[in-house]
């Protein structure tokens, strides 16, 4: 019996049940992934005990020589991974990374261009319920009604009209390749800075299966989980000329002590991402997404933009009685985890939605490949066809569990 299970069996039991859920359910939330045992070990280490305000070699606390080693490793590996001049690995999350860049470039009331949340953007790209929408004058851009892909001509028109201080590029639910040179050219016409939030595609970028935004943007932010398959956290990449400003905007600007156990885990994840097998893994994520999209469309599902170029897709129920909320709940009962999601030109409430977001990073970490994607599409179709039929959904769950048992993830952690 573990120390935790002896002292706090309630927490230990919840952790065990979550381990079983991750092991036996089909995880299709596009922003989720499973870290390696090495990353778990680093994050669960004694590094969690150390305060280390400041930066390597310039701390406000003594005893930081060992945490300096891991932070420097994380920084240098991140720079190598993305070809960046400077990396700050201290942001606790992607939102803090984005906030630091806003603070470095903009004053309250300045104009920014950001992707409309319902068209695939992110809360921190100017949503009115977020700090980014409250502090700045936000001009949203979106996708074309015809292609459901980014309308670059409209972005240029808006930029020329509103003269933004910064253009925010990136998305949380956009299934297509983003044209970074096009955004750079638009920004240059109006003298704007470019911030690319590559949180969703960082792993794809690191492996060279999606274009790299670093050469085209003054600032690139990301989370370190999602496709990058590291611990939950954030990071900022920037040109050397902005290094001091960015560092000061993180500490002491918006954060105090960094989470050194998480930074240690980031360093490990970045080393993993530098290995040849990581490229193979990212290529498989994209292959799986393409196959799943193909199979879903063959079963009659409408996908926003007609498919995917990356790791995710949006199943669009517009024009049907099915809602994203109902589909999410039915799939959950079938052992398949997705999230309801707004779709472009959404007509329903964000608490109900007309779509679900589906992604392949986590199931690819389990080892599923194209053959299994055909089965996955069948599970999804069967579950959506049986909304409200709990008996049928329970039967699908058994089939899902049987499939996932063939692809163990954390076998040593199961009882």
Swiss-Prot record:
Q: Which residues does the annotation say bind (6S)-5,6,7,8-tetrahydrofolate?
A: 117, 121-123, 241, 349-351
Where in the cell does this protein reside? Cytoplasm
Which catalytic reaction applies to this protein?
(6R)-5,10-methylene-5,6,7,8-tetrahydrofolate + glycine + H2O = (6S)-5,6,7,8-tetrahydrofolate + L-serine
Alphabetized, the UniProt keywords read: Amino-acid biosynthesis, Cytoplasm, One-carbon metabolism, Pyridoxal phosphate, Transferase
* PROSITE patterns membership: SHMT
| Known role | Catalyzes the reversible interconversion of serine and glycine with tetrahydrofolate (THF) serving as the one-carbon carrier. This reaction serves as the major source of one-carbon groups required for the biosynthesis of purines, thymidylate, methionine, and other important biomolecules. Also exhibits THF-independent aldolase activity toward beta-hydroxyamino acids, producing glycine and aldehydes, via a retro-aldol mechanism.
Q: What is this protein called?
A: Serine hydroxymethyltransferase
Give the source species.
Trichlorobacter lovleyi (strain ATCC BAA-1151 / DSM 17278 / SZ) (Geobacter lovleyi)
């Amino acid at each position: 019996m573990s120390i935790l299970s002896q002292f706090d069996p309630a927490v230990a039991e919840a952790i065990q049940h979550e381990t079983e859920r991750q092991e036996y359910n089909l995880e299709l939330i596009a922003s989720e992934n499973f870290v390696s045992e090495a990353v778990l070990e680093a994050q669960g280490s004694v590094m969690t005990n150390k305060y280390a305000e400041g930066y390597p070699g310039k701390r406000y606390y003594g005893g930081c020589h060992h945490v300096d080693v891991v932070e420097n490793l994380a920084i240098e590996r991140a720079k190598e991974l993305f070809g960046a001049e400077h990396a700050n690995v201290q942001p606790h999350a992607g939102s803090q990374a984005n906030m630091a860049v806003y603070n470095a470039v903009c004053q309250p009331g300045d104009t920014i261009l950001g992707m409309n949340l319902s068209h695939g953007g992110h809360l921190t790209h100017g949503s009115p319920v977020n700090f980014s929408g409250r502090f700045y004058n936000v001009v949203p851009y979106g996708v074309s009604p015809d292609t459901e892909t980014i309308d670059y001509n409209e972005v240029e028109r808006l930029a020329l009209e509103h003269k933004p201080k910064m253009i925010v590029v990136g998305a949380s639910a956009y299934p297509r390749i983003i044209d970074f040179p096009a955004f750079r050219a638009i920004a240059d016409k109006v003298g704007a800075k470019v911030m690319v939030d590559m949180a969703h595609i960082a792993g794809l970028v690191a492996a060279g299966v999606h274009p790299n935004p670093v050469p085209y943007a003054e600032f690139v932010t990301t989370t370190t989980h999602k496709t990058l398959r590291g611990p939950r956290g954030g990071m900022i990449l920037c040109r050397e000329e902005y290094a001091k400003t960015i560092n000061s905007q993180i500490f002491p600007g918006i954060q105090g002590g960094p989470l050194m156990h998480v930074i240690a885990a980031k360093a490990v994840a970045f080393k993993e991402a530098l290995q040849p097998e990581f490229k193979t893994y990212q290529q498989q994520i994209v292959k799986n997404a393409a196959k799943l999209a193909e199979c879903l469309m063959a079963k009659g599902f409408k996908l926003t933009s007609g498919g995917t170029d990356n790791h995710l897709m949006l199943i669009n129920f517009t024009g049907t009685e099915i809602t994203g909320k109902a589909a999410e709940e039915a799939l959950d009962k079938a052992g398949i985890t997705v999230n309801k999601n707004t779709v472009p030109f959404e007509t329903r409430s964000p608490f109900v939605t007309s779509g679900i977001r589906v992604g392949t990073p986590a199931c690819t970490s389990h080892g599923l490949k194209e053959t299994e994607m055909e089965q996955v599409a069948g599970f999804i179709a069967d579950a959506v066809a049986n909304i409200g039929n709990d008996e049928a959904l329970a039967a699908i769950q058994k089939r899902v569990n049987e499939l996932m048992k063939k692809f163990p993830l954390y076998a040593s952690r199961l009882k």
